[in-house]
Regions:
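N-terminal beta1-alpha1 ligand-phosphate binding loop
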Residues: 1-30
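Glycine-rich phosphate/pyrophosphate-binding loop and the adjoining helix
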Residues: 134-208
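Secondary-structure boundary/capping motif
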Residues: 12-15, 44, 79-80, 114-115
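N-terminal beta-loop-helix "entrance" segment that forms/cooperates
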Residues: 37-55, 149
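A generic structural motif
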Residues: 28-34, 132-133
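Short hydrophobic segments within beta-strands
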Residues: 6-8, 36, 106
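Helix-loop-strand module that forms the ligand-binding subsite of alpha/beta enzymes
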Residues: 51-130
């Protein structure tokens, strides 16, 4: 499986980047995770031609080609960072690559809550009509006290959190497999229905 990991902040020292980098290395035998930065993208400005900047278009294509997306978000004032919200607005207004795309939400914070309120808000945003992401239900990974969570090699020090992350990622991989198959089947049936004509129905009736 191939996943795109989005660092949901422009902070150069964010532990959310460390979390995704740990996941990339820790799960390398199970899946390929490409960690993507969003800090250099321009702020969303609702262009009249609905054409995304080049960097947004490149990321959008990567999302299209991936089996799923992992977003790691910090929490600023009970919500997600402005740079992450801006990216989502670009995607929803232009290329819409998150439609039917399986998404796993994780997060790290310096405090004890592990970006829980930001994650809840992000899930709500991703369910918007022009996004329609397939968000993994029932599982959330919250890494609190994240400044102390990693060693100098980027390894996650909390063994109970490693176990929890293993379980969440295993569930996500299963969720991705099931979701993508269901979406594929649904799109096939929709296409077949679109091609259906009343003439075909009449011909079928005559043959009967």
């Amino acid at each position: 499986m191939k996943f795109i990991g989005i660092v949901g902040t422009n902070s150069a020292h964010s532990t959310n980047r460390k979390l995704l980098q740990f996941m990339r290395d820790h799960f390398s035998e199970t899946a390929e995770i490409e960690v993507c930065e969003i800090g250099d993208f321009p702020a969303f400005n609702e262009p009249k031609n609905k054409v995304a900047p080049e960097g947004i278009s490149v990321l959008s294509e990567k999302i299209n080609e991936a089996d799923g997306v992992i977003i790691s978000t910090p929490e600023y004032d009970h919500s997600i960072p402005a740079v992450l919200k801006s990216l989502i607005e670009w995607l929803s207004y232009t290329t819409r690559p998150l439609i039917d795309k399986p998404v796993m939400v994780v997060g790290a914070s310096h405090g004890s809550l592990g970006s829980s309120r930001a994650q809840a808000h992000l899930r709500q945003i991703l369910d918007a009509p022009e996004l329609k992401a397939r968000i993994m239900p029932g599982s959330e990974f919250l890494l609190g006290h994240s400044l102390q969570a990693f060693d100098e090699n980027g390894e996650l020090l909390y063994s109970e959190k490693v176990t929890e992350l293993d379980e969440c990622f295993e569930e996500f991989c299963l969720f991705v497999s099931i979701t993508n198959q269901l979406v594929k089947d649904h799109r096939f049936k929709t296409e077949q229905n679109r091609k259906f004509t009343w003439e075909q129905l009449a011909e079928g009736g005559e043959r009967a």
